[in-house]
Amino acid sequence: MSRRCAITGKSAMNGHSVSHANNKTKKKFGVNLRTIRIKLEDGSTTKIKVAASTLRTMKKASK
C-alpha cells in the first residue's frame, strides 16, 4: 500500500535540504499519516490511512 492519504490523495513530495553553506541535497518530504478507524453506513468499521492535516480538518468539521 502506498504512503498516500485515503481521502485527499496527499503523498510525498521532493525538495532540498539546504545547509548553512547553502549546499543542497535532495530530500523526500513524507506525509504525516495516521491509521484511523471509521464507521461505515452499514455499521461496520474499517481502517484507513489519513494525513494528520486531513484528520484535523475532519475534527474541526464535526464540531
Swiss-Prot record:
Report the protein name in the record. Answer: Large ribosomal subunit protein bL28
Q: Which Gene3D superfamilies match?
A: Ribosomal protein L28/L24
**Family statement:** Belongs to the bacterial ribosomal protein bL28 family.
Q: Which SUPFAM superfamilies match?
A: L28p-like
- For the keyword Ribosomal protein, the answer is yes
NCBIfam families per record: L28 (TIGR00009)
* Stretches for region Disordered: 1-22
Identify the PANTHER family for this entry.
Answer: 50S RIBOSOMAL PROTEIN L28, LARGE RIBOSOMAL SUBUNIT PROTEIN BL28A
Please list the GO terms describing molecular function: structural constituent of ribosome
Is Ribosomal protein a UniProt keyword of this protein? yes
Family annotation (InterPro entries): Bacterial_rp_bL28, Ribosomal_bL28, Ribosomal_bL28/bL31-like_sf, Ribosomal_bL28_bact-type, Ribosomal_bL28_sf
The biological processes this protein is annotated with in GO are: translation
A GO CC annotation recorded here is: ribosome
Q: Which residues form a coiled coil?
A: none
User: Which Pfam families does the entry mention?
Assistant: Ribosomal_L28
Sorted UniProt keywords? Ribonucleoprotein, Ribosomal protein
